[in-house]
Every structure is written in C-alpha cells, then in structure tokens.
Amino acid sequence: MKKRAQKSKKGIDMFGVTFFVFIVAVIGVLGVAFYYQQTKASPGEPSTRVIKKTQEQLKSELTIYPTLYVTGSSGTPKNNISHLVQAVTNKNNTAKPGLTVIAETGNKYKLRITGKIDAGNKYPAIAVGTDHGTNNHEIYQYAIKATIEYLAAHYNVPWYNILGYSSGAGGAMRFLINYSQDKNLPPAKKFVALDGEFNRKEKLRANESMESLYQNGPENKSADYNYFEKNYSKMDKGIHVYLMALDTPVGSDFDGVLPWSDLFSVYNLFEKNGNVTEKFTYTNSPGERYSHGSICKMPAAQDYIEKVFYSST
C-alpha cells in the first residue's frame, strides 16, 4: 500500500510539472502573439514633435516645397512609387529626386532616411513607405505625419503637395483630415489620389450609378468610408484635390483591382467640404496592359501628375 501511494504521488507530481510547463508555454505563445500584434499591426502613434522656429532660423534654412509620394499596401516604394518619382523627375520640370523615407511602424514611426536634398533643389520628391506592408489607413496617417514633421524640423517648408497611391491615398486623406489644419505643421496645397483605395472595394448596388455616387456618395459603405464621411469637414478646404482612376478594360469602371465605386467614393465628400476637386480617368493605349499594380509606370498617369504638381512652378 505504501509503494502504491508513493507511485500515485509521483504521478501527481509529474502531472503538475507537465501542466506547469504547458501553462508557461501558452503564456509565452500569447506573449509573442501580443508583441507581434503591437509591433506589426497596431497603428500606435508617433511622438508629437512641436516645431517652433524664429524668423532668423527660417531665413538661414533651405526653403523647399516638397511633394510626398506615398506608396501602397506593399509598404516599399521600390515596386511602384520609385518608378513614378523617377519618371516625373526625369522630365523637363522643377522636380528633382530628394529623399526616400521608411517609417518603422513598430518603433513609434522612427524614420529611416536615404538620399539628400541639395541646396538648389527647391521642389524635392519625397518617397514615403513603411517597413511592413499594410493597408491600414491609420498607419499611413502616422507615417506621413512623422515625415512632414521631419521635413519641417530640418527645412523651411512654406507648403507641400502629397500623392497617395492605392492604400496610401486613404492614409493621406486620413492624415489631411486630422492634421491639415494643425498650425504646428506646414499647409498642404494639392492632394492627388492615384487609384486610391477609400472604400475597401465596395461595389455599386444594382440600382446605383456612378452619377448618383458622385452626387450622393456610395450606398455600400465600409468602416473606412464611414470614418471619412464622419470627419471630412475637418480637412482644410483650400487643398486642391485630384482623383485619378484607370479604366481597364475600357468601359468597365475598374482598374484591375479596385472598382471606380471605391476610387471615386470620396468625391462627394470633397465637394461638400468646398475643396476644388477634379476627376481624371485614363485608359490603356493600343499595346499597353497597365492595371492597378503597374499604374505608376503608365506614361499617361505620369504626365498628368507632372502637370498637376509642376506646371506652375
């Protein structure tokens, strides 16, 4: 009986050890998952940088009028925005290559910056991306905010332009809603949405037309669109807005990934806010096969963007 009791006690002890190890392992897995979510998925918020300068400081700094080119959900500019920047800055205009800025989304949007802005470069192109791919508009909002704050801290920036491609356009709109009237930051002059994603691919309803969408907004509304609809009036009314959309195949009201009911879903909001708003649609020429993922390489899109940003500089 005594030996049997000892065996039973050992069995209980082994069970207790095994159960303890199991609990520790579960806690560890949950901890890693929580850390991953915080560093990879959570928008977080960058530290606020309040920039105040004297007139003497402003006079001594290089004055620039930058244009931010914000990438899409891949995060990296090299597959899309870099082609657009290269094409635009190679044309006969005032634009020149400037900086490539990558925001570390899990590190309070610390910026990794390459390139330089030379003394004679008044209209630098700034490519903006993130260290991890995302279609979260809030993450892009903070990446843009950190970039603008960096530029304002190191240069005299009377104003800037901004282009957002795909998900980056939704992020740019969210940034403009929340920060375009922030007196600590320079004002935005023009906003271009290149095949911008605002309404999570929501399509027209059976009885709905694009004309009714332009007049009244979409009937199918995503959570992102609901945010824009609730907050659009916070955006600076002086910003000139350009919404661009590819049509492929011709007459499909589709860019290969996103329907026009998404790309133009916010047109009505800009109109109601009093922003001068223009729509630009384009199609493939014979022999061309551009779609949403390659639109930054399309000559027609590049030419229009150059005209918008640099025709009067």
Predicted segment positions?
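N-terminal Lys/Arg-rich, disordered targeting/topogenic segments
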Residues: 1-14
